[in-house]
């Protein structure tokens, strides 16, 4: 798993699309993800919410304020990878969320 990749993720009967947010070198044992809210959810003007772009493999908004540790047993199909521009926006949102600017 690499940073910026998007996957289907299942917990119980709930399915979600997630994006790997942690650095690739940590992902074999300590991956962290952010949930991609559905396309029907409007992206509020909040610095920790990243709207996906036309070239991304999923439509919606990445919610950086709800980071979670990945359970590898819950990971389903790989959907694709975020575009470089969306990944840069994700970087900025993470720095904002952790007050690292």
Regions found by a protein language model. Give the residues of each.
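Conserved functional hotspots at enzyme active or ligand-binding sites that engage polyanionic ligands
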Residues: 1-101
């Amino acid at each position: 798993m690499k940073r910026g990749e998007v996957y289907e993720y299942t917990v119980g009967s709930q399915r979600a699309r997630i994006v790997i947010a942690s650095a690739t070198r940590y992902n074999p044992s300590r991956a962290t993800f952010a949930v991609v809210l559905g396309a029907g959810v409007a992206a509020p003007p909040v610095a920790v919410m990243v709207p996906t772009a036309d070239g991304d493999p999923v439509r919606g908004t990445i919610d950086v304020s709800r980071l979670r540790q990945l359970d590898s047993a819950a990971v389903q199909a790989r959907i694709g990878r975020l575009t470089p521009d969306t990944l840069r926006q994700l970087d900025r949102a993470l720095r904002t969320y952790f007050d690292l600017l």
